[in-house]
Swiss-Prot record:
The gene is rplX. This is Large ribosomal subunit protein uL24. Coiled coil: none annotated. The lineage of its organism: Bacteria, Pseudomonadati, Pseudomonadota, Betaproteobacteria, Burkholderiales. Pfam families: KOW (PF00467), ribosomal_L24 (PF17136). Part of the 50S ribosomal subunit. SUPFAM superfamilies: Translation proteins SH3-like domain. Keywords: Ribonucleoprotein, Ribosomal protein, RNA-binding, rRNA-binding. The keyword rRNA-binding applies. Belongs to the universal ribosomal protein uL24 family. Gene3D superfamilies: 2.30.30.30. One of two assembly initiator proteins, it binds directly to the 5'-end of the 23S rRNA, where it nucleates assembly of the 50S subunit. One of the proteins that surrounds the polypeptide exit tunnel on the outside of the subunit. SMART domains: KOW.
Length: 102
């Protein structure tokens, strides 16, 4: 069970975007893309076959999953634990004990 999923509200713990909060857009094997975090400028060539124009575009780049933490109701970063009740696994915040994404 993944501890961080698409749609979760996270905060960046390390790096140039430390302290920024955003929503997880995608989860890859060990990386996540977070809305508005780690934005890079990419040069795109024009493609007349597709009708796209060239130029410099902003692209959201993935960051390692260990560099983000879920945000609790108080806006503080929290680790995530797994709780099993009746054979059903649920994600639980370590700081408050509240269930995540219920």
């Amino acid at each position: 069970m993944n501890k961080i999923r698409k749609g979760d509200r996270v905060i960046v713990r390390t790096g140039k975007d430390k302290g920024k909060q955003g929503t997880v857009l995608a989860v890859l094997a060990e990386h996540v893309t977070v809305e508005g975090v780690n934005v890079a400028k990419k040069h795109v060539r024009p493609n007349p076959m597709l009708g796209t124009t060239g130029g410099v575009v902003d692209k959201i780049m993935p960051i390692h999953i260990s560099n983000v933490a879920l945000v609790d109701a108080n806006g503080k970063p929290s680790r995530v634990g797994i709780k099993v009740e009746g054979g059903v696994k649920t994600r639980v915040l370590k700081t408050t004990g509240a269930a995540v994404g219920a």
